Amino acid sequence: MRAELAVYFIAGTQDIVRGTLPSVLEEALKAGITCFQYREKGAGALQTASERKEMALECQQLCAKYQVPFIINDDVALALEIGADGIHVGQNDEEIRQVIASCAGKMKIGLSVHSVSEAEEAERLGSVDYIGVGPIFPTISKADAEPVSGTAILEEIRRAGIKLPIVGIGGINETNSAEVLTAGADGVSVISAITRSEDCQSVIKQLKNPGSPS
C-alpha cells in the first residue's frame, strides 16, 4: 500500500479547469500517478447518482488500463456496486465502523485524520489500510478544510509509534512535497497541483522524484 500512495491524485469534475475529468486523469495516469481517488463534492460537482456512477465507471476503466488503484470518496454504496479498489472517508463522513463492516476484505479503506489521537484510533480499529493526514498546507480545493497543521503533525504521528501508511493531504505541490515525505509521509495527495497545471507530466515527475529538475 505504501508504494501506491506515492503520488495520490484526487479529483472530481468540480476540480477541472480545462478539458474533462477523464482526459485530465488519463494524462496523469500516463505521467505516472500511483493512485486515483474520485471525489465528487462541492460547487460544480455532478448532482445525480446516475451521473456520478457513469463518471466513476469511466475513471475506473482508465485506472484499470494503467493498473492504478481506483478509490471512491465517501460513497460506500457506489464503491461496492462497481467494485472499486478502495473507499476513503473523512471524520465527518460515513461512520468508520459502518464502513469497515461493509467494506473490510473487499477493498482498501482509507481514513482522513487531523490529530495524533485520531491516528491512534484509526490504528486501533485494525481494518484501516492507510490514513490521510492534513491539511498540511493551505488548500484551495476544499472549502470546509480543517485548520492547517503543517508538517509537524506527521512527525508527531510517527513519534507516537503509529505504523499505518500515511499520505499527506492539503496544499501539496511539487515545490513542497519533499517536506511532507521527510516529515514521515509515505506519499502525497494532490488536486490542484495537477488539475491546474499546464505541464502535468513535469509536475508528476517532480512529485515522484522530489528535488529532480523539471
Curated annotation (Swiss-Prot):
GO process terms (BP): thiamine biosynthetic process; thiamine diphosphate biosynthetic process
Family (UniProt): Belongs to the thiamine-phosphate synthase family.
Binding-site residues, 4-amino-2-methyl-5-(diphosphooxymethyl)pyrimidine: Q37, Y38, R39, E40, K41, N73, S112, K142
Keyword Cell wall biogenesis/degradation attached: no
SUPFAM superfamilies named among the record's database cross-references: Thiamin phosphate synthase
Native source organism of the sequence: Listeria innocua serovar 6a (strain ATCC BAA-680 / CLIP 11262)
Native organism taxonomy: Bacteria, Bacillati, Bacillota, Bacilli, Bacillales
NCBIfam families: thiE
GO molecular function: magnesium ion binding; thiamine-phosphate diphosphorylase activity
Assigned GO CC terms: cytoplasm
Record InterPro entries: Aldolase_TIM, ThiamineP_synth_sf, ThiamineP_synth_TenI, TMP_synthase
Sites where the protein binds 2-[(2R,5Z)-2-carboxy-4-methylthiazol-5(2H)-ylidene]ethyl phosphate: T139, I140, S141, G171, I191, S192
EC number(s) per entry: 2.5.1.3
Protein name, entry field: Thiamine-phosphate synthase
Function (record text): Condenses 4-methyl-5-(beta-hydroxyethyl)thiazole monophosphate (THZ-P) and 2-methyl-4-amino-5-hydroxymethyl pyrimidine pyrophosphate (HMP-PP) to form thiamine monophosphate (TMP).
Pathway entry: Cofactor biosynthesis; thiamine diphosphate biosynthesis; thiamine phosphate from 4-amino-2-methyl-5-diphosphomethylpyrimidine and 4-methyl-5-(2-phosphoethyl)-thiazole: step 1/1
Keyword Transmembrane carried by entry: no
One Pfam family of this chain: TMP-TENI
Gene name as annotated: thiE
